[in-house]
A protein has these predicted regions:
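Iron-associated oxidoreductase/ferritin-like identity signal
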Residues: 1-158
Length: 158
């Protein structure tokens, strides 16, 4: 099915963001793991894997629309040197992602590409949930202090 060129480019922008998220979340997960924050590392790794599933869906959609997925392009990866910096960098990435998703959804609606719209809307819900989680973690750090927050992140939940 030949897709709209603007939608394909928009999907490639989403793909760039998802691939960047995979890398940023993965390195943050590995850093947390190396610092002994296993519980937090597991949660961040889950987010990296979620982004990978999103990237796969976007690639499949681009191919369905007879486009070429651009897997070579990445946004700048922001690596936090401490947990609060990581969470803030990830929050910034999610805010940008939500903006891109909303623009891509609006374009899909405009050109009548309901398949892309539906896929993007489902992904947007996931991105919004991640944003809420990040916001909550940063608020916890603010309220109880980073050392108390990190003490809760040492062991995996049973």
């Amino acid at each position: 099915m030949k897709g709209n060129a603007k939608v394909i480019e928009s999907l490639n922008e989403i793909l760039t963001m998802e691939l960047s998220g995979i890398n940023q979340y993965f390195i943050h997960s590995k850093l947390c793991e190396s610092w002994g924050f296993e519980r937090l590392a597991d949660k961040i790794r889950e987010e990296s894997l979620s982004e990978m599933k999103h990237a796969e869906q976007v690639i499949d959609r681009i191919l369905h629309l007879e486009g070429v997925p651009n897997v070579q392009r990445l946004d700048k990866i922001k690596i936090g040197e401490k947990v609060s910096e990581q969470l803030k960098a990830d929050l910034d990435l999610e805010v940008a992602a939500i903006s891109r998703f909303n623009k891509a959804i609006a374009l899909a609606v405009e050109v009548g590409d309901n398949g892309s719209r539906e896929m993007l809307a489902a992904m947007l819900t996931s991105e919004e949930a991640h944003l809420h989680w990040l916001d909550s973690q940063l608020e916890l750090i603010k309220q109880i202090g980073e050392s108390n927050y990190l003490a809760q992140q040492v062991h995996k939940p049973e």
